């Protein structure tokens, strides 16, 4: 099939391969800059609206939008850290009672197991007991290794590095927001008029699809939030609003879903002996999963024109290649490729 490729297509193919290889090594160390560029692209419509609505120059509009964005991030971060510290303190205070509850459940299980295995062969009972003890020992050893003071200290030692990355992100974001029009002009200056029109079409299509993807995720997550809020008000009204907000935020991330919160919560309630609440939480998780799997493909197909299978494959491959950043870049690359085909930049019309 390669003999049907023209010289221009060979050049584009080689450039694409070089771009992928370079990206594989460069992307992991340039995550703050890439996130800053993507954020600047998302905030650019707000900057243009400020310029049009209030007759401001580019620098003043960028400064206002940037400050509003930083204030929003600061408020959300402060709230998240405060809630996390509060929950950790409550967990530490209630840890003895949690341990006692789990011990009581384990004692009840052991008593039930002893009464259940009275008529069984002693060899079988001994084998099961040994396997259970090995599992408990392995789990305890793993938890002990993860919770060692050295690991906690190593994580704390990386906090300055994270702060530096965040500072680089903020500085790069402000500069990208200022320089976006100039960067676009320089990029289009390297193209012919025909190619420039195709690139503009691809950018417009890509922007439409990306915002459509975010809109679709938001619409699906709103449905999830309403159903989750109603269900939790019926199951545990004391924490219904807070947990619904947490589940809504987590569910906004593709693939992860509400099961990440409701699954462990239901399992814990079953372990401590609250079978009714554990079963209700598990049922709510199943209902939310069914809603997402039913509604999401239709909403996604309507807003971005990318099949759920292609989205899943792109996310998984990107996640395996370059980590969390690939989880986002994977579908974007597929969308960019499809947009380039629609614009005529890439001609994929050969047949075997």
Swiss-Prot record:
GO molecular function, one term: antiporter activity
Record carries keyword Cell membrane: yes
Membrane topology of the entry: Multi-pass membrane protein
Protein name from the UniProt record: Sodium-lithium/proton antiporter
InterPro entries: AI-2E-like, YtvI-like
Main location: membrane
Keywords: Antiport, Cell membrane, Ion transport, Membrane, Sodium, Sodium transport, Transmembrane, Transmembrane helix, Transport
Top-rank lineage group of the source organism: Bacteria
Function recorded in the entry: Catalyzes the pH-dependent efflux of sodium and lithium in exchange for external protons.
Entry's family note: Belongs to the autoinducer-2 exporter (AI-2E) (TC 2.A.86) family.
TM annotation in the entry: 11-31, 32-52, 61-81, 159-179, 216-236, 241-261, 271-291, 317-337
Subcellular localization: Cell membrane
Any Gene Ontology biological process: sodium ion transport
pH sensitivity of activity: Optimum pH is 9.0.
One Gene Ontology term, aspect cellular component: plasma membrane
């Amino acid at each position: 099939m390669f003999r049907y490729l023209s010289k221009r297509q060979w050049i584009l193919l080689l450039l694409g391969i070089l771009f992928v290889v370079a990206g594989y090594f460069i992307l992991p160390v340039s995550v703050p800059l890439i996130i800053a560029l993507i954020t600047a692209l998302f905030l650019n419509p707000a900057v243009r609206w400020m310029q049009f609505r209030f007759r401001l120059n580019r620098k003043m509009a960028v400064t206002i939008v940037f400050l509003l964005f930083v204030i929003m991030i600061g408020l959300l971060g402060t709230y998240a850290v405060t809630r996390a510290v509060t929950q950790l303190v409550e967990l530490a205070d209630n840890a003895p009672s949690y341990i006692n509850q789990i011990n009581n459940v384990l004692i009840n299980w052991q008593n039930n197991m002893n009464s259940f295995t009275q008529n069984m062969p002693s060899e079988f009972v001994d084998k099961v007991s040994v396997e259970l003890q090995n599992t408990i020992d392995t789990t305890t050893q793993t938890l002990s290794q993860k919770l060692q003071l050295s690991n906690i200290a190593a994580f704390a030692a990386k906090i300055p590095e994270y702060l530096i990355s965040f500072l680089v992100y903020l500085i790069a974001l402000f500069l990208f927001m200022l320089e976006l029009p100039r960067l676009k002009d320089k990029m289009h200056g390297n193209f012919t008029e025909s190619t420039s029109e195709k690139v503009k079409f691809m950018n417009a299509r890509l922007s439409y699809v990306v915002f459509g993807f975010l809109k679709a995720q938001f619409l699906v997550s709103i449905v999830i939030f309403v159903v989750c809020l109603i269900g939790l008000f019926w199951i545990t009204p004391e924490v219904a609003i807070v947990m619904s907000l947490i589940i809504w935020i987590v569910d906004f991330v593709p693939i992860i879903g509400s099961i990440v919160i409701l699954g462990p919560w239901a399992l814990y309630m079953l372990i401590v002996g609250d079978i009714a609440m554990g079963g209700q939480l598990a049922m709510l998780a199943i209902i939310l999963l069914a809603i997402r799997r039913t509604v999401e493909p239709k909403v996604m197909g309507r807003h971005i024109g990318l099949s759920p299978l292609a989205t899943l494959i792109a996310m998984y491959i990107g996640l395996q290649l370059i980590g969390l950043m690939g989880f986002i870049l994977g579908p974007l690359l597929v969308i960019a490729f499809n947009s380039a085909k629609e614009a005529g930049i890439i001609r994929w019309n050969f047949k075997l």
